[in-house]
Curated annotation (Swiss-Prot):
An example molecular function term from Gene Ontology annotations: ATP binding
Keywords tagged on the record: ATP-binding, Endoplasmic reticulum, Nucleotide-binding
Family as reported in the entry's similarity comment: Belongs to the heat shock protein 70 family.
Species the sequence originates in: Phaseolus vulgaris
Residue stretches spanning the membrane: none
Name this polypeptide is given: Luminal-binding protein
């Protein structure tokens, strides 16, 4: 999801990878 990518970039790549 694009949202996850944005959140991951803002909060941390860790979250982005988890949601990806």
């Amino acid at each position: 999801k694009e949202e996850a990518k944005v959140l991951g970039t803002v909060i941390g790549i860790d979250l982005g990878t988890q949601y990806l």
